[in-house]
């Protein structure tokens, strides 16, 4: 699996490609998913429980959720769903990591 570099040309035309998003807190995961859809891609969104917006489930082509201590499961989730490129978008609240 390859991480997205952030280069705008990398997302110029996704032609149905499934891109993974590990989603934390804030608007950035939503904006990232919308940008991928605008470029013809599909999104597999794995949200971090108690961090991500609930609305992400409605815009995901494939959706899952993990706890903050289970982030390592993201690779399995993305591989299982055929994702070849993925990115993380959004904040992880440090305070919740230790609870």
Where are the regions a protein language model picked out?
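Short active-site-proximal "capping" loops at secondary-structure junctions
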Residues: 27, 49-53, 71, 93-94
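N-terminal beta-loop-helix "entrance" segment that forms/cooperates
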Residues: 48-67
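N-terminal glycine-rich phosphate/adenylate-binding segment common to multiple enzyme folds
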Residues: 71-99
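Conserved active-site and cofactor/substrate-binding residues in soluble primary-metabolism enzymes
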Residues: 14, 27-31, 66-73, 81
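Conserved acidic residues
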Residues: 17, 61, 84
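N-terminal basic/disordered segments at the start of proteins
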Residues: 2, 7-48
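Short glycine-/acidic-enriched loop or helix-start segments at secondary-structure transitions
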Residues: 31-32, 55, 97-99
